[in-house]
């Protein structure tokens, strides 16, 4: 289609004069490379005058071109002004534009017919509205589907509308008919068209077909051919480097002198800038705020009032004024509720005489700081302070200058208190789940452990290896294991749920094994003779003694004692004939004492003030200690009376142990405190130590004469202490923290569950929630 006349007119106004190559070089690029080192490479040093003449000629040409351009622009402006001034012509154009063409009639050619309409814009001027292009059938885009131009908006927004989006011109894209889609899908299933994929275009809702190019691409990929047509996967290599050595340079011309001397043109421009800076024509940039600040500084002058002041020493009797006390919580505009007075307190304060009031104000509460009113008595308070400073005499109080370090006790260095455990020597692995209890036998050769898997395992301490294991329960965990404290027998007591098992490991000395079995079997004859006597009162026995069964007897478990509630703690008497058990959930029967030689169980307390946690026998006297959640009670077993109540001050006692001397004990609590008690000194703790960020699970004294004790915490560490106790009642115990042993992992907020000492060496065993036991040396 040929362009119309108005289009030609616009094209003429927008045409730019074509320039030849010489004009481009001389005119457009003039100055781009002037005064540079690259142009000076091709110009001789003696031809500078000729270069200046050429530059003048180029400038004249540029001025002529600019003059011609300005003339053309002026003609266009005159033409547009004449068109706007001709009102009759504009109205006629608007009328013809509204009719859709010129006034030549149907005989006018399509080439001369304008492709626009003239309408009035919002300001009353002329606006040209061009008709939409109507491409012919042969056009490339005539068969192209209109794209949906809604962008990233989900199509779910258009589910309630008959259209699915808009074209680039803002026209609605109507949703295809469902009946037609069903018919098309039926026809496509009968005869598959070319490019059919079975998918639907989410933007238009129409079937998504492949083009011919895409089909060709898929065919090439299927035939294992190169997808892109005309691509050569093996192009000829270009030998950038050859094996021929070029000894001579391509150009041996010497470097010109101008490469090594400063440029004269740049020197001229630099000197021009230097002169401008010296004359003050070029000033550094300063912001508006800086300029205003300089102007204010010029107008105002400041003087030092104390310039001539001479420093003087303060008077001998000068006492500085006391400082005001800092404000408290009651002076806050939003104090805590406990600081606010009640209605009765407010009335009482108002009735009091102002001189009798403790405070001159009552605490008040406001929602925001902006709502706080002015302080009524502010001026009065400041006036009274001035009177106090001016009238009240001042007294200087001398403070004692004492070094705080001198108040601390002088403790020995940890290096001087060796031996004590410092490193992990061996790791005992075998339990599944937590290892809840561990114990070393009186000979110091064997280690017994019990865990959540229901197994009791016997280990050889050095070297670390397992020698025997027995499964006591499939449902309950083994909460406690303790050896009988005699060297002539090897009897181990273990608690799993409500059952207590007494066993003799088979892999020991045959004589010791025979003696141990005889001690356990002796009680069955005594129990058979006194069975009727124990049940004549009609009450149920405290515990039931029986054989555990053929399977357990073959493995070395000889006696099973069943109590009323799950057992958590087992503690032996020093002679080995009695042991006590603690069941925290047992209420009245939480503490029970068992006699091994008679197979007899007794409940010593009818009622306990609190839940029992731990119980121990005194190492040398007939005393029995029972710890509840907050107190430790000491009972005399001969006189059957309460002797002493120890008050550690802890919130929840987890464990305690008695010193071999019998006059001191240590207490561990779940509130992260380790407390040392001197029973001869007071019922209150002598020392309170906080070295763990988590709860303390177990504490233990060394039984072999070494002044050592340890605690185990849920933070996965053990703390080793030196605790020296002397027989002199005038001297207190010396407690020194020695070493923090870390090695266990914290699992489910549980770290080290139990700790025990070697009977003769400075070694300790720790049982952890990570399923391992560690030997520390």
Curated annotation (Swiss-Prot):
Family matches, as Pfam families: BOP1NT (PF08145), WD40 (PF00400)
Composition bias, Acidic residues: 36-67
PROSITE patterns assigned to the protein according to its UniProt record, in alphabetical order: WD_REPEATS_2 (PS50082), WD_REPEATS_REGION (PS50294)
Family the entry assigns: Belongs to the WD repeat BOP1/ERB1 family.
InterPro entries in alphabetical order: BOP1/Erb1 (IPR028598), BOP1_N_dom (IPR012953), WD40/YVTN_repeat-like_dom_sf (IPR015943), WD40_repeat_dom_sf (IPR036322), WD40_rpt (IPR001680)
Repeat as UniProt keyword: yes
Complex formation: Component of the NOP7 complex, composed of ERB1, NOP7 and YTM1. The complex is held together by ERB1, which interacts with NOP7 via its N-terminal domain and with YTM1 via a high-affinity interaction between the seven-bladed beta-propeller domains of the 2 proteins. The NOP7 complex associates with the 66S pre-ribosome.
Region annotated Disordered, chain positions: 1-122
Transmembrane segments: none
UniProt keyword annotation of Repeat present: yes
Record's keyword terms, sorted: Nucleus, Repeat, Ribosome biogenesis, rRNA processing, WD repeat
Locations listed in the record: Nucleus, Nucleolus; Nucleus, Nucleoplasm
Known function: Component of the NOP7 complex, which is required for maturation of the 25S and 5.8S ribosomal RNAs and formation of the 60S ribosome.
Gene Ontology molecular-function annotations: large ribosomal subunit rRNA binding; ribonucleoprotein complex binding
Gene Ontology biological process terms from the UniProt entry: maturation of 5.8S rRNA from tricistronic rRNA transcript (SSU-rRNA, 5.8S rRNA, LSU-rRNA); maturation of LSU-rRNA from tricistronic rRNA transcript (SSU-rRNA, 5.8S rRNA, LSU-rRNA)
Positions annotated as WD repeat: 430-469, 473-513, 562-604, 606-645, 648-687, 691-731, 747-777
Protein name: Ribosome biogenesis protein ERB1
Entries under PANTHER family matching the protein: RIBOSOME BIOGENESIS PROTEIN BOP1, RIBOSOME BIOGENESIS PROTEIN BOP1 BLOCK OF PROLIFERATION 1 PROTEIN
Domain of life, source organism: Eukaryota
GO cellular component: nucleoplasm; PeBoW complex; preribosome, large subunit precursor
